[in-house]
């Protein structure tokens, strides 16, 4: 109690930090002893009414004299169970997400496009600190910037003598940010959530100097959907990462996500989901279906959106809402853009967890036979030929000793097909697109990592998103990667400047003779080769578009 009282007095006595924006407005933040935070700054007009689903419009009203001391609400979320076969859990979660309690703990709404800047205490304009811009994950269905506190990373940067400024932003998810279909393409409104991120990066370029940051030293980083979003920003406008003639960012870090294996915005599955949302919203007979969707209440749109499959429903990573090639900003199939060199030329770090697919395979426990697994893959990958499905199933057999969690032998096979499906989902969505990117990226220096830290954890192993724990909440030996090495990369473009106990090798190709991966296990860090599951790589990525969704 005494310590808490002393700390509260220090906070109250310390002068509130200020920053001056590019337009001359001065704003006030929160002094939190070890850092100073400016939270919930609007960077776009509220995307409501006629702006629903559209790319964002920059915020233009004066902020002069305003205080920004708490996070803004997250953007609207969908129920991640989506159209679960059993109505009870879906209905219960729908009710919870719309309850006053949920809104009090995790507020969300359409007026949500805000940005947060957190800096070490005492940072002044002219400090020119490197800037790390975080893009959150959540399957393009849920999430918000307030869920990822940056204090651990900022503290680590100060202790290293390599202080950074941490920026995070909200962006629209689910139908609000990634609705697809021909009507969306015709209007030019595809990938609104990516546009939100881009406008946030432009806000950083315009304003971060007033907080003590260096706009020429920006690193973008993210996990899961955030990592895929980083990739989309690398591919934006065929790799043009400039704004007002200068780069928006000089480096990128991707944690569990690379190119999105998705059809165009007017492709069959995106159109199917659009039609489903339209019908559920009661707009099926409207002459202008988009106008109808813009006119309905937010609660009604939430219900219609949550009538589509969610990440935790049976179709799993065949997500209803994804970044998709729109012919304008994501100009083509993302794998082709990387092959053709249409990717920003910046240094990158990209890595994965060893068992990325286990959590997502829990929604398909009713698949127990080879025949059912084949049907599951046929339904998931509608472009794949019978021969390609045969090759996939041969590369990922039902032999439980070969599935995920990997290297666990006969254990963790909660159904005869669970480990097989977990292996396919993890490799298709996360692990092997990383290898494809590294083999084809023609840009800057490349580093890659793979974690096996939780290999002894039953059923889910070193599962998707466990890195967030060691990055933002708890310190372990892997924090040397997720904090220290990333901070060194943002400062010096070299993760080895963090003083790791092993040298992190540069990656040239998956076939290079030396080690090319930094690996993490339960005991520490070591290096190894990116040469596992080559048959799976060939099955999935000899013709990547066969497995697009």
Curated annotation (Swiss-Prot):
Position of the signal peptide: 1-15
PROSITE patterns with a match to the protein in the record: CARBOXYLESTERASE_B_1, CARBOXYLESTERASE_B_2
Gene3D superfamilies reported for this sequence: alpha/beta hydrolase
Catalytic residues identified in the record: 224, 356, 464
Catalysed reactions listed for this entry: a triacylglycerol + H2O = a diacylglycerol + a fatty acid + H(+)
Keywords from the UniProt entry: Disulfide bond, Glycoprotein, Hydrolase, Lipid degradation, Lipid metabolism, Signal
Keyword Coiled coil appears in the UniProt entry: no
Glycan attachment positions: 366
EC number: 3.1.1.3
Record-annotated disulphide pairs: 75-112, 283-292
CDD domains the UniProt entry points to: Esterase_lipase
Entries under InterPro entries matching the protein: AB_hydrolase_fold, AChE-related_enzymes, CarbesteraseB, Carboxylesterase_B_AS, Carboxylesterase_B_CS
Molecular function terms from GO: triacylglycerol lipase activity
GO biological process: lipid catabolic process
Keyword Hydrolase: yes
Record family assignment: Belongs to the type-B carboxylesterase/lipase family.
Name this polypeptide is given: Lipase 4
Organism for this UniProt entry: Diutina rugosa (Yeast)
